[in-house]
A protein has these predicted regions:
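Residues on the lipid-exposed face of transmembrane beta-strands in outer-membrane beta-barrel proteins
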Residues: 35-39, 52-56, 102-106, 121-125, ...
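Extracellular loop and loop/strand-boundary signature of outer-membrane beta-barrel proteins
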Residues: 38-40, 85-93, 140-146, 177-182
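Repeated loop/turn-to-beta-strand initiation elements of outer-membrane beta-barrel proteins
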Residues: 31, 61-66, 112-114, 162-170
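Sequence/structural signature of outer-membrane beta-barrel proteins
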Residues: 36-44, 72-75, 111, 125-130, ...
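Sec-dependent signal peptide recognition
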Residues: 2-10
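Residues that define the transmembrane beta-barrel architecture of outer-membrane proteins
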Residues: 29-31, 46-50, 94-100, 115, ...
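Short glycine/proline- and aromatic-enriched beta-strand/turn motifs that initiate or cap beta-hairpins
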Residues: 19-58, 64, 123, 191-199
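Gram-negative (and chloroplast) outer-membrane scaffold detector with strong preference
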Residues: 55-138, 190-199
Length: 199
């Protein structure tokens, strides 16, 4: 009888401990710091990108965040006047972008499971550096200047977090960007990353 009570007591204590550990994985008042890599999708094809972000769990559901991303190449289209031609021509080219923005993750805990879906919305600035581009216009290679630009952009999307334990986790996210300014083409990114949860 004592052995049975001992086994039952250990099982109950183990369940309580597991419940407490699971419940404490998704908690308010913690920071998440992490990096990510993925692919960006512009007007033509996908390209590698990466970045990092920091979130703060104001509550178990609301996480304000800041994020930096670098896109080595985003496709763009533009109508330009070419020397020697009497009419404007449409050109396509790739240019690197940097994105810095803030927003909020809306986390949706499901019965304290370690897998947590979330939505995201943000607003910030996208910067394209000044550079020279080479384009082919009617069989002729032409070098054109591209001015630097910094424009506001909104973004939205969603993803999944998986909390490996109370300290570490991984996440996958998909997001669309809508820039303002001269280049208004919507582009997106799909990313996978890790994070460290700090209290």
């Amino acid at each position: 009888m004592k052995n049975i009570l001992r086994v039952v007591s250990l099982a109950v204590l183990g369940m309580i401990g597991l419940k407490a550990q699971t419940a404490s994985v998704v908690r308010a008042g913690s920071y998440e710091v992490g990096g990510f890599v993925g692919a960006s999708y512009g007007i033509d094809k996908s390209r590698f990108m990466g970045g990092a972000n920091v979130t703060y769990a104001a509550t178990k559901w609301i996480l304000p965040y800041t994020e930096f991303s670098y896109f080595p190449g985003i496709g763009r289209r533009q109508s330009r006047t070419i020397p020697g031609l009497t009419r404007p021509v449409d050109i396509s080219y790739n240019i690197p972008l940097t994105d810095f923005h803030g927003g909020v993750h809306i986390r949706i805990p499901i019965r304290e499971l370690p897998i947590v879906p979330y939505g995201v919305i943000g607003v910030g600035m996208i910067h394209a550096p000044e550079r020279q581009i080479n384009v082919n216009v009617e069989g002729i290679q032409v070098k054109l200047p591209v001015e630097a630009s910094t424009n506001a952009a909104v973004n939205f999307g969603g993803g999944l977090r998986y909390y490996i334990n109370q300290r570490f986790g991984v996440r996958a996210e998909a997001k669309l960007y809508k820039p303002s300014g001269q280049f208004k083409e919507t582009f997106g990114k799909v990313e996978f990353g890790f994070f460290v949860q700090l209290r």
